[in-house]
Curated annotation (Swiss-Prot):
Pfam families: TPP_enzyme_C, TPP_enzyme_M, TPP_enzyme_N. Keywords: Amino-acid biosynthesis, Branched-chain amino acid biosynthesis, FAD, Flavoprotein, Magnesium, Metal-binding, Thiamine pyrophosphate, Transferase. Mg(2+) binds at D447, N474. Its cofactor is Mg(2+); thiamine diphosphate. The lineage of its organism: Archaea, Methanobacteriati, Methanobacteriota, Methanomada group, Methanococci. This is Probable acetolactate synthase large subunit. GO terms for cellular component: acetolactate synthase complex. GO terms for biological process: isoleucine biosynthetic process; L-valine biosynthetic process; sulfur compound biosynthetic process. Pathway: Amino-acid biosynthesis; L-isoleucine biosynthesis; L-isoleucine from 2-oxobutanoate: step 1/4; Amino-acid biosynthesis; L-valine biosynthesis; L-valine from pyruvate: step 1/4. SUPFAM superfamilies: DHS-like NAD/FAD-binding domain, Thiamin diphosphate-binding fold (THDP-binding). Belongs to the TPP enzyme family. Binds 1 Mg(2+) ion per subunit. The keyword Flavoprotein applies. The gene is ilvB.
Length: 591
């Protein structure tokens, strides 16, 4: 058997059925073996989109997503997508072609140091030097990617290794693999759990801060039981959105720079903060000196490197969130729980102050109104939102959705949180739809982010993948525009995108149905049509470019929420004639 065939067998042994990729010279043996395989390969139109799609697949399913590229520029094009997965602990297997082993280091055509390139942005990476290494390497890669704190793993595949022969009976795919030094701790220390339970039971103003680790661990049910048993309000990070139903009376919404008033004030006023599967990023804490200043902090995380990294923990617990929460609840049941009613009254008061105004009839459309109508349409189609997945891009579109859209289920709100990658949302939606074909998958994106991977319209058209793309079209890089208006004297530098393209015509040119929404009274009807069509569909929503969310200034206190300044766009664009004049003047000086 050839090495390339062994790679296919190894993928099949891991339960992989669908991969995303783009072929090239250094991966030709693999693609030749793929021809006779039952694996489904989705040909994206850019390697970055293959990585994002594999990431979206992983986030929606909880399984490892697989992306493939050739060597050199194919590998470099994967980098942004793999770095995105790494920042958000998403299990992606990235396969890259490589020049033959005897040419490595000779600057051969399309050679690049793939190991060095991927090392800082992967949980682990391998370069296979002999065909007989394939079975064990692939088993190890999937084990590492999907256990402990998940993350991407890269495998570099020299062309001669793919072409080489392997005796699969002599070198079978192992059921288990020995990984010296890799022993993720999944069960929390009993003494630490006992201490945490006592602190929670005696607390007067507890708050839970739930991060993406709750979703990764599958601990949403345990979180709900804990919150309801002790009556603890729950706020989430962006990555934790969906781990706790946001229509629950104890739900506070997202905390941080773009968080809700209820969440930010509750964290600031609490006396015990139970942080689960979160890394206390700067966007969550603001000024650390004033973050939960009166609270004892319990920090639960499977990665010991996160404990104490950004915020000091009074009771650190290293372990899998599901296991720790189960044991914590068992310990609490045996204790007398102090009454929390006074605190809950304060929480409900904060929640009343946080109710947003969303029912705007303005034109251009306010994003809040679109999100409100989207929620109503989706709840009508899927009342518990069990079969709905939202992906967002990065920028204002992400924050409007995080702030206003009430998520009810884990793995139903997919966003690039750590790296903040524009261009993530649309290809991630492709991966999510492939992973969950019966879910309604809606890609919410800004016009800037959409244009970074708009070529994937060809992919959804070619494979008939019924994703609904909703573009928040304000012809502006909205988040940068908002910051420039707030912090840079309204000097709007390079944030206006101009009038092209016509997104409806662009989609139609790829064979994708499309429509434009310019009035609030069109939103529901056109959304329903798009979602129920079960076809690839693009909606171009013309929104108010000057609309912005309140926010906490960078490095500010969570309670220092600044109202945005409404500033109309001041478009300043040099035309090509001006550019030519500048170049002509430079040429005269050189002469």
């Amino acid at each position: 058997m050839k090495g390339a065939e062994a790679i296919i067998k190894a993928l099949e042994a891991e339960g992989v059925k669908i991969i995303f990729g783009y072929p090239g010279g250094a991966m030709l043996p693999f693609y030749d073996a793929l021809y006779d395989s039952d694996l489904v390969h989705i040909l994206t139109r850019h390697e970055q989109a293959a990585a994002h799609a594999a990431d979206g697949f992983a986030r929606a399913s909880g399984e490892a997503g697989v992306c493939v590229s050739t060597s050199g520029p194919g590998a470099t094009n994967l980098v942004t997508g793999i770095a995105t997965a790494y920042a958000d602990s998403s299990p992606v297997i990235a396969l890259t072609g490589q020049v033959p082993t005897k040419l490595i280091g000779n600057d051969a055509f399309q050679e690049i140091d793939a190991l060095g390139l991927f090392m800082p942005i992967t949980k682990h990476n391998f370069q296979i030097k002999k065909p007989e290494e394939i079975p064990e390497t692939f088993r190890a890669a999937f084990e590492i990617a999907t256990t402990g704190r998940p993350g991407p793993v890269h495998i570099d595949l020299p062309k001669d290794v793919q072409d080489g022969e392997i005796d699969i009976e002599k070198y079978p795919i192992p059921a288990k693999v020995d990984l010296p030094g890799y022993k993720p701790k999944t069960v929390g220390h009993p003494l630490q759990i006992k201490k945490a339970a006592k602190l929670i039971a005696e607390s007067e103003r507890p708050v839970i801060l739930a991060g993406g680790g709750v979703i990764i661990s599958g601990a949403s049910e345990e979180l709900l039981r804990l919150a309801e048993f002790v009556k603890i309000p729950v706020c989430t990070t962006l990555m934790g959105k969906g781990c706790f139903p946001e229509d629950h009376p104890l739900a506070l919404g997202m905390v941080g720079m773009h968080g809700t008033k209820a969440a930010n004030y509750a964290v600031t006023e609490c006396d015990v903060l139970i942080a689960i599967g979160c890394r206390f990023s700067d966007r969550v804490t603001g000024d650390i000196r004033y973050f939960a200043p009166e609270a004892k902090i319990i920090h639960i995380d499977i990665d010991p490197a996160e404990i104490g990294k950004n915020v000091r923990a009074d009771i650190p617990i290293v372990g899998d969130a599901k296991n720790v929460l189960r044991d914590l609840l068992a310990a609490l049941i045996a204790l007398e729980i102090k009454d929390k009613e006074t605190w809950l009254e304060r929480i409900y008061e904060l929640k009343k102050l946080s109710i947003p105004m969303m029912d705007f009839d303005d034109k251009p459309i306010k994003p809040q109104r679109f999100v409100k109508d989207l929620m109503e349409v989706l709840n009508e189609i899927d009342s518990k939102l069990k079969n709905t997945i939202i992906t967002t891009d990065v920028g204002q579109n992400q924050m409007w959705m995080a702030h206003f859209f009430k998520t009810k289920m884990p793995r139903s709100f997919l966003a690039s949180g750590g790296l903040g990658t524009m261009g993530f949302g649309f290809p991630a939606a492709i991966g999510a739809k492939v992973a969950k074909p019966y879910a309604n998958v809606i890609s919410i994106t800004g016009d800037g982010g959409f244009l970074m991977n708009s070529q994937e319209l060809a992919t959804i058209s070619e494979y008939d993948i019924p994703v609904v793309i909703c573009i928040f079209d304000n012809r502006t890089l909205g988040m940068v525009y908002q910051w420039q208006n707030l912090y840079y004297g309204q000097r709007q530098s390079e944030v206006h995108l101009g009038e092209s393209p016509d997104f409806v015509k662009l989609a139609e040119s790829y064979g994708v149905k499309a429509d434009r929404i310019i009035s609030p009274d069109e939103i529901k009807e056109k959304l329903k049509e798009a979602i129920l069509s079960n076809e690839p569909y693009l909606l171009d929503i013309v929104i108010d470019p000057a609309e912005a969310l309140p926010m906490v200034p960078p490095g500010g206190r969570l309670t220092n929420i600044v109202q945005p300044i409404r500033v109309e766009p001041k478009i300043k664009k040099p035309q090509f004639d001006e550019i030519k004049k500048i170049r002509d003047m430079a040429a005269v000086k050189e002469f």
